[in-house]
Amino acid sequence: MSDEVEAGFVRVRLDLSYDGSEFSGWAKQAGGRRTVQGEIEDALRTVTRSRETYELTVAGRTDAGVHARGQVAHVDLPREVWAEHHVKLLKRLAGRLPRDVRVWALREAPSGFNARFSAVWRRYAYRVTDNPGGVDPLLRGHVLWHDWPLDVDAMNAAARGLLGEHDFAAYCKKREGATTIRTLQELSLVRGEDGIVTATVRADAFCHNMVRSLIGALLFVGDGHRGPEWPAKVLAAGVRDSAVHVVRPHGLTLEEVGYPADELLAARNKEARNKRSLPGAGCC
C-alpha cells in the first residue's frame, strides 16, 4: 500500500493535546457528534480559507472521554496553501480552536513520515486513587476513584506476566479483520506522594479497549479480588473474561508517541502495515 504524498502537496506534522471530557473520541462520526478530528479539520479549513476539508491521520484514535498530552497527526496540504499560511498558522489555530484542544507545533514532515504507521510506540498513563475520601475535585476529570485499597506491588507482579508479544484478544474488543497481536513493551505502576497510582503502558500499538481492560484486570489484583497470576491466565486463555472490566475513560491520557530516526520512517511505515501473526499461529 503506497503512502506517497500527492504531487503538489506537502505533508505537515501536528503535535497536539486535548481534554477528552467533552469529545466523542478522536474520529469524525455521523450525526454531528463533537470530535477532536472534526474540530481541528474545521479550524484548518477556516484559517486557510479553503473550500476543501483536509483529512487528518492520527497516531492514536482515542475513544470518547480519553485525553491526550502528546498526540501526533499529519495532514497533506496543497503546497501553495502551506506556503501562504505556515508562518502564522499556529497562532491562527490557537485563536480558532476551542479551549479543550491545542496544536503546539506544525512543521513539514520528513520523507516517509506517517503519523500512524511510522510510530514505533505509544505511551499511555492511567491514573487512579484509592483515597478513602475520593478524588481531588481539581483532578476529578483525569483520575479514577477506586474504593478499595490497592496493593501496587501485587499489581506490578501481575503486570510483568503480560509483557512481550502476545495475542491480546482477551483484553481487546473484537473488530472484524483487525489483529489483536501486540508487543507490550512497558506496564508498570507507581504511587506518587499525592497517593495517586499512575500506570504507564507502552506498546507498539494498541487494539480497541486494550489499555483500559489491562488496567481493569490489574485493579482486581490490587484490591485482592484476584491473585497476581490471574491476568496472565486470562491472556493465555485468549477469550474475554467477564471479570475483566473496561475501566472508565477519564483516567487515561495518551502521553507520547515515539518515532524512529528520519531515515527509518519509510521502512517502519511499510513494516507496520503488514498484518502480524505469532510464530506457529494459523494464518488468515
Curated annotation (Swiss-Prot):
Gene3D superfamilies (UniProt xref): Pseudouridine synthase I, catalytic domain, C-terminal subdomain (3.30.70.660), Pseudouridine synthase I, catalytic domain, N-terminal subdomain (3.30.70.580)
Keywords from the named record: Isomerase, tRNA processing
Coiled coil: none
Record-annotated active site: 63 (nucleophile)
InterPro entries recorded: PsdUridine_synth_cat_dom_sf (IPR020103), PsdUridine_synth_TruA (IPR001406), PsdUridine_synth_TruA_a/b_dom (IPR020097), PsdUridine_synth_TruA_C (IPR020095), TruA/RsuA/RluB/E/F_N (IPR020094)
Top-level EC class as recorded in UniProt: isomerase
Binding site for substrate: 124
Pfam families membership: PseudoU_synth_1
One GO term (biological process): tRNA pseudouridine synthesis
Enzyme Commission numbers on file: 5.4.99.12
Catalytic activity annotation: uridine(38/39/40) in tRNA = pseudouridine(38/39/40) in tRNA
Quaternary structure and interacting proteins, as annotated: Homodimer.
Role: Formation of pseudouridine at positions 38, 39 and 40 in the anticodon stem and loop of transfer RNAs.
Family annotation (NCBIfam families): hisT_truA
Membership in a protein family: Belongs to the tRNA pseudouridine synthase TruA family.
Name assigned to this protein: tRNA pseudouridine synthase A
